[in-house]
Amino acid sequence: MDPVLGLGLFAFALLLLALPLAFWKVSSEKTSGLVTLLIATANLALTAQLVLRWWQSGHFPISNLYESLCFLAWACTLTQLLVERSWPTPIVAAAATPMGLGCIAFASFALPDQLQEASPLVPALRSSWLVMHVSVIMVSYAALLVGSLLSVAVLVTDRGHALELRSSSIGSGGYRRAALATPLGNVGDSEVQLSSVKFTRNELLDSLSYRTITVGFLLLTVGIISGAVWANEAWGSYWSWDPKETWALICWLVYAAYLHTRLSRGWQGRRPALVASAGLVVIGVCYIGVNLLGIGLHSYGWFFG
């Protein structure tokens, strides 16, 4: 077996073991040290896979759909580990592991053999912009996907109850309101420092989701801008309304709407989580769906390994 494919399957096996273990630890409310170890080992295996493919091909391993899926799985597991450093809980693994698992499964079992092999770069990708643009876009997708999955976890753990989350996300200014009794017996609002407040599980999930999506949105913005500059150098136009470009813009607008609703503090709880969840579908169309169409400047990923 090709060692590149073998490393991918090894990472798949580790994540496949980590996922049910994470759900079991969530239900039993136990710590997630073993789950984190499995995910970290899977990330190391994916790192070795990408380095080996880079050595085999002689170029940055993100030139076809197989390589980009493996890179996305690596970025998702790394993002997941970074999020768990802020809040070491199996809920994060239970919510985010399916994304990395799905990426590896699709790359290893769904793609034709010829697309799993290393191949020369197509002419459009023979540029120094490859690493800057494509890798930043893929890392932004990873952050947005993990953040959106955490929003899905908010909706699932909410179990249909109305939420009014006031977490330490951007827009709260480091404070949240708490109802306090006044000397006259009335109930008034007072600003309470976040460091003195014990957050609920949903508040922590909401805050982590928001922060992760914010990072992903900023990276997506950088990726789109760098892609426009690259397009101008390659084809003489910053924007051509290629299907991938159009859906990248739609993706940017969806998450811009999510951040706007949070920053304005007009929406809290379930509604912004629903917007973030919709972003999962938009990224899926932008990343995979457009490639299946086989049209446009970005269609090389599926049909032309």
UniProtKB/Swiss-Prot annotation:
GO terms for biological process: cytochrome complex assembly. It is found in: Cellular thylakoid membrane. The chain crosses the membrane at residues 4-24, 32-52, 58-78, 91-111, 136-156, 212-232, 246-263, 275-295. It is a multi-pass membrane protein. Signal peptide: none annotated. InterPro entries: Cyt_c_assembly, Cyt_c_biogenesis_CcsA, Cyt_c_biogenesis_CcsA/CcmC. Required during biogenesis of c-type cytochromes (cytochrome c6 and cytochrome f) at the step of heme attachment. NCBIfam families: cytochr_II_ccsB. This is Cytochrome c biogenesis protein CcsA. It comes from Synechococcus sp. (strain CC9311). The lineage of its organism: Bacteria, Bacillati, Cyanobacteriota, Cyanophyceae, Synechococcales.
